[in-house]
Amino acid sequence: MELSRRVFSALAGTTVLGLALGGSVSGGAVPASGASGPVPTGPPPAPPGADGVRHRVAFDRHSLLVDGRRLVLWAGELHPFRLPSPSLWRDVLQKMRAYGFNAVVVPVAWNQHSPAPGRYDFSGVRDLDLFLRTAAETGLYVVLRPGPYIGADVDAGGLPGWLTTAEGDARSTDPAFLRHADEWLTHVDAIAARHQYTRGTGTVLLYRLDAPRRDLLSHLHEKVRADGVDVPLLHGDTPVAWGEAHGTADAAEARRVHLTHLAHGVTLHDAGTVFGGTSWGWLAAPSAPTPTYDPAAALDEARRPTDGIAPLHQTGHLLRHVPDFARLDPAPAVPADDARIQVRHLTNPDTGAHVYVLRNDSAADVTARLPLDGTDVPVTVPAGDARLLTAGLDLGGGRKLAYATVQPMLTLSAGRLDIAVFVGRTGEMAHVVLDCPDEPWPTRLDEEAAWAYDEDRLHVTVPLGAGGLTRVRVRSGGSDRTLLLLFADDAVSLRLWPYETPSGKGLVYGPALLRGAVLDGDTVRLTGDMVDAYGLEVWTPRGITGVTWNGRAVATSVSRARSLRSRRPLPGVTQPSLPSLDGWRRRDENPEADPGHDDSGWTVADRRTSHSTTPVPAEQPVLFADDYGFHYGDVWYRGRLTGAAGLESVSLAYSTGARGMLMAWLDGEPLGTHDAGQGDDGKGTWTGTAGFRVPQRLRERLRDQASEGRPHSPVLSVLVRRTQHDQDDYRRARGLTSVAFRGVSPEVHWRVRGAAAPDPVRGPLNTGGLYGERNGWHLPGYDDGGWESVSFPRADRRQGVTWYRTTFRLDVPPDVDASVGLTLDDDPDRDYRVQVFLNGWNMGEHVNGGPGARRTLVLPNGVLRTRAAANTLALAVLSGGGTPAGPGAVRLTLLGSAAGGVPVTPVASPGRGTP
């Protein structure tokens, strides 16, 4: 079975990967690759790091085997190229680790690193080596995806723009393409090889190849191995539907999806996009054209948890802390007494533990009875949801779970205490039953709990969510260790954070996030985030008597639950204030529409052939922007017409990605605009023909000039917002494709101009071909002293581009992580677009009133200076003149804040004339 972009595969039964872990293996039963014999259920390997020790990675039909221990991989996808602030990579990776992930899937976009053939850049926001070091320091395995084609809703699927005009068919074994692809992999693999977990120099555990054809796959396999990559190789090329959310912000749907995968024996999980980030610059693909990428991700663009994160958090820690899930076999069917509940039964052959996944695809909540360990147990599964139940789990100290109606989240031993956490939905009654051959001594530590002992079983019931975390202590009952049962609903579970140290495990309750726990003598030093004021409770390894939080000592006392509990709540975050945006300056541009504009330095458009899949019209030159080296953003055309007297109308055919558009002028006179539209989600290219009548006064002028013997050669100026390349058919043309005239057929000599040379810091996808971009109007330090002073809102009517600039300062305290956005409020009937530049970085396009338009664009810290430094904000407003054009109200918005965070280094943002 091949790996997909959403789910790797089930390493279960006799199913293996098309390109197997460690090498090419055909389907059928496969012995453990590199395993010396059967590997029993046991503790997972320690969290990974660059420890300098060689590691062995193998697999059998159940799971990966790392140094002889079973590993269930719980991975989420993060696109470093969608977060242009390397300091924040650590923030997101730490959050992934805290929320239960043990691996990160990392696509590497070729187009971010290669502005031209033979040129590669892995510096700054493209520093792959830094990202891999950070992942290792965070304790996460890495699944590396360097493509060459990655999809990922990136322009051309990650292929560089210059490849659109190169010989050779991409994603094939065409030798011309393979020369470029091999060169790309040579550069990536040199970095990857330095970070392989097998060598102890990093945490790259798996390397994924993306290829639609077996011959290409074979070539890539040989190439990667020749480059010194020796970790297991995976293969996957099945995309989700374009436009489909890759994650899900709905907790019920997330539970249903991921528990279904678990029920089918999956032990290599790709939970989808954990952090979507920003499609800044011209990074986006037609399938996801808005700056905000994957709003259904577990962490939103502002790095805040979404509603869908609770089941990921619970399942991730379950798979980490309950080793039974690393070796599950299908077991005899155990049907519920209501057919609307589908039940999948699995068992661990080593421990005898049973796992039941109940799924309800109906539109109504369903309560059914399920036979668990000889007892018919009533279980409710909400509509469109799923539930995981277990029986026979080892809870430590020789205690066994008979059954439970709620899901275990984790089991661990902290000092002399065994801890088991059970989670469920708010308002439901949790019922946990323990086998106790001797009468136990249970103690309610919170009043919500109730218990009863009957027929050698202890029954504990708790209404979830009634009073926060509910604690029940159990002594005796056939064990010489104390068991602490903890009960939480989804919200409370997100305040529970297990941690691991060389001296043992522990658990923290209370903070919004736990980033780290380090033992220092008799003290545990905790770091993390607080949002609201809340108490802190810590279960520790033996010998720990003190606690610090973010470097400050916390006064604690020992609770009846054997925890160190803070004597007073930890303080929440102090909300920072944001300045108003004023002091705006304005300037119109598009001198390219002026017939007298000097275009002698522009590229002559006179080619007659192209590698594009778009046909070149007969008897017309190639006008496709890519063929002249302009691969991203806006492109200008100027056609000088000879014999234009009698011209009645002009028809301009053009091709763009999603939300493309065109506007035209003839001899400086506006002809109008044309919008290619949004179209269907699955569409990768939009084509349109803009028909414009020549204004009567211009027709008369051209006619009079011709009749007076002084024929004039008018200039047809066209601006095309060509937007994204198709992910699949990446060679489809962008820009003008053909031109037709009515009345006469003038001779036309075309010149074309797009983006200037790529920004060496911000990269090739940052800017397009607007006059202001080419001349640095978006950059810090540009002298706008001669521009007009204005205030918002604006109501201008003109066809073309208008720029606005201002500066502002933030003063966020150093111990506060504040996420800030730029909000543009206006009447949706006003038709215009805004490119937002922050300190020279193109943060994306706001289409006022457009489909899916988001009024708030996230400004990532690092690009945004938050510590008393100046920020330059530039807005490039593109309007057609048919309606008043804004901006309306423009303001900074606080999207979220926390006391804590990570240190943020400002991202290099050179200004006008800065080296």
Task: Kindly give the residue locations of the regions a language model identified.
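Non-catalytic C-terminal accessory domains or segments of carbohydrate-active enzymes
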Residues: 49, 309-872, 876-915
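The substrate-binding groove and active-site-proximal loops of carbohydrate-active enzymes
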Residues: 75-85, 110-126, 165-182, 208-214, ...
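Catalytic-core region of carbohydrate-active enzymes that cleave or remodel glycosidic bonds
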Residues: 223-231, 235-287
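Aromatic- and acidic-residue-enriched segments that line the glycan-binding/catalytic groove
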Residues: 118-123, 148-171, 283-290
